[in-house]
Amino acid sequence: MSLIDPRAIIDPSATLAPDVRVGPWTLIGPHVHIGEGTEIGPHVIVRGPTWIGRHNRIFQFSTIGEDTPDLKYKGEPTRLVIGDHNVIREGVTIHRGTVQDRSETTIGDHNLIMAYVHIGHDSVMGSHCILVNNASLAGHVHVGDWAILSGYTLIHQHCQIGAHSFVGMGSGVSKDVPAFVTVLGSPAQARSMNFEGMRRRGFSPEAMNALRRAYKVVYRQGLTVEQALVELEESAKQFPEVAIFRDSVRASTRGITR
């Protein structure tokens, strides 16, 4: 028995692994690759050029690899690349890149992207991230591994959301969020470190205490960013986690969320 519903429309140039499942009334366009073990539900649209890896599950009414509405986009053949073991729930929209940036939108592995999330053009998402219902990323956003974006969060274009960070429900983020930091509000403000996430992932008490001290250096001592980075140097040599935090602060291009 075919794993592709006869009511689905598959472009002849699309390449699907033999065990890919495709539901009814789904449209898969030209220049799409779908890897083994992936399941595409009913009423899904996948446009190319798009590369979807192995063992992903995409639910109904999602639109994957659509042209960006960015007014600079003039129909160039940009790409979307999705890794392995991702779950993309109902009504998600993910746009391809633009030639003004990387020409590619990239999603890593083992991400949970819940209903009605939007991921804009040229965004880069790491692995093991969770985006809760109706979170929206504008174009050119970078999201680090293990980040969690709660429901109805809005991320401004070109923002960096650091690894292991947590963005609270309904937050409006217009500046960069350093690694491990919890932010909340609209406009978002830094509240603490994401210690609950660290505990769940097995971080040592020593590393969490070092990050607690590092947070105070950046956010509680009235230092400039440059001064705080100098203060973090010794701790960063002892704890790789502090080095990750320091590097994310240093890499900020929009200024960090305070």
Curated annotation (Swiss-Prot):
Gene3D superfamilies attached to this UniProt entry: Hexapeptide repeat proteins, Udp N-acetylglucosamine O-acyltransferase, C-terminal domain
Keyword Membrane on entry: no
Known function: Involved in the biosynthesis of lipid A, a phosphorylated glycolipid that anchors the lipopolysaccharide to the outer membrane of the cell.
Any one annotated GO CC term: membrane
Name of this chain's protein: Acyl-[acyl-carrier-protein]--UDP-N-acetylglucosamine O-acyltransferase
Pathway assigned to this chain's UniProt record: Glycolipid biosynthesis; lipid IV(A) biosynthesis; lipid IV(A) from (3R)-3-hydroxytetradecanoyl-[acyl-carrier-protein] and UDP-N-acetyl-alpha-D-glucosamine: step 1/6
Subcellular localization, as worded in the UniProt entry: Cytoplasm
Major location category of this protein: cytoplasm
